[in-house]
From Swiss-Prot:
Keyword Kinase in annotation: no
Record protein name field: Optic atrophy 3 protein homolog
GO biological process, one term: mitochondrion organization
Alphabetical UniProt keywords: Coiled coil, Mitochondrion
Pfam family, one: OPA3
Job of this protein: May play some role in mitochondrial processes.
Effect of L122P: Homozygous mice have their visual function which is severely reduced, consistent with significant loss of retinal ganglion cells and degeneration of axons in the optic nerve
Coiled-coil positions: 120-143
Amino acid sequence: MVVGAFPMAKLFYLGIRQVSKPLANRIKDAARRSEFFKTYICLPPAQLYHWVEMRTKMRIMGFRGTTIKPLNEEAAAELGAELLGEATIFIVGGGCLVLEYWRHQTQQRNKEEEQRAAWNALQDEVGRLALALEALQAQAQAMPSLSALEELREELQEVRGQVCNAHCTSKCQAASSKK
């Protein structure tokens, strides 16, 4: 049984997401304790969230034009801290998704480049083989055909026969009998 490579990147992202929850809880605790954090970071988003939520609920129930009272500071700080914690988890999760997408795109791009390089190498090899084939075909056409060789052999024997008849020497007869 072949075991594939363990996806270390996915394990790393899962670890980051698991660490983000306690991190969000620490941020919430710090937001509750720090006056600056509470006043400038937690309260404005909490009041805005409360206003949008209440306005939406009022419109759904059919009440229009009613004024919405802002949350008291304690409730707004609590809601702001919760929103901040959830935003932290969301941002970490979104960051992990973006990193995973980027990693996948990089792998895909590398794979396509490898395929393109292999394709180009195959095309080069086919071109080289086509040139070699053309050269071999040209050599084959330049060579005399088998029937032409037979004709030349017959002419050679006729010439030998004529030379032998003309000189009638024993050497010529011996030479023609060897062939």
